[in-house]
């Protein structure tokens, strides 16, 4: 089924296509079990994600220098580990944990659905995640896109309307010809 007037689909991937929570919880639980630490992996994952988005707001306001999601996640991780004090990780272990964002699994059915949608639409990523995260997770899940747009290369971050407008322009379409696909209402 083709939606009249829509030529391209831009996908949020962190949560919509890839299960960030499951990846983080699983890895934090594994590390916690190895250390015999008492860490609520679900809360840790939530705190990490929230802290990253708070830091992103500081980047957007100019209070922090420009940095991509890899650097934002790594910065946020230090604060979250301090909050969940029973998990002790060296700098190199923290760097390795930060790489879990590059190995998020796709939700069941997502890969097949996107491949099917590519038959009718240009399908791309439009994300605040880094280009490297989007590429690595796509490869990890054998997921092909027509393009990947990371806000790290744009002048604006989602949910700023100009990020969506710039994405449409990069695709050669008017904004009304591009549909954002996301599982949260802010997009």
Region annotations inferred by a language model:
Residues 3-108:
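N-terminal helical cap/lid subdomain that shapes the substrate entry/recognition surface
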Residues 41, 144-147, 174-179:
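Short acidic capping loops at alpha-helix termini that bridge into adjacent secondary structure
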Residues 91-104, 110-140, 148-151:
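Substrate-recognition element of Asp-dependent hydrolases with the DxDx(T/V) motif
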Residues 17, 126, 180-181:
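Conserved SAM-binding loop
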Residues 23, 105, 131-133, 186-187:
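Short alpha-helical
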Residues 157-186:
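Conserved Lys-Pro-Asp/Glu-containing loop-to-beta segment of HAD-superfamily phosphomonoesterases
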Residues 2-4, 119-120, 170-177:
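Glycine-rich phosphate-binding loop signature in dinucleotide/nucleotide-binding domains
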Residues 44-45, 144-156:
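A short, structured active-site edge motif that brings together acidic residues
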């Amino acid at each position: 089924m083709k939606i009249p007037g829509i030529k391209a689909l831009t996908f949020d991937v962190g949560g919509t296509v890839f299960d960030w929570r499951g990846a983080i919880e699983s890895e934090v639980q594994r590390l916690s079990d190895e250390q015999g630490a008492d860490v609520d992996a679900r809360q840790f994952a939530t705190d990490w994600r929230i802290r990253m988005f708070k830091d992103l707001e500081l980047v957007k306001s100019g209070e922090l220098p420009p940095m991509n999601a890899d650097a934002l996640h790594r910065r946020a991780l230090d604060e979250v580990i301090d909050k969940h004090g029973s998990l002790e990780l060296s700098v190199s272990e923290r760097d390795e944990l930060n790489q879990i964002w590059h190995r998020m699994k796709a939700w069941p059915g997502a890969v097949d659905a996107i491949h099917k949608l590519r038959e009718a639409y240009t399908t791309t990523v439009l994300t605040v995640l880094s280009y490297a995260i989007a590429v690595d997770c796509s490869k990890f899940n054998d997921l092909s896109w027509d393009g990947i747009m990371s806000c790290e290369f744009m002048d604006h971050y989602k949910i700023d309307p100009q990020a969506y407008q710039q994405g449409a322009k990069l695709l050669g379409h008017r904004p009304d010809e591009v549909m954002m696909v996301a599982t949260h209402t802010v997009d």
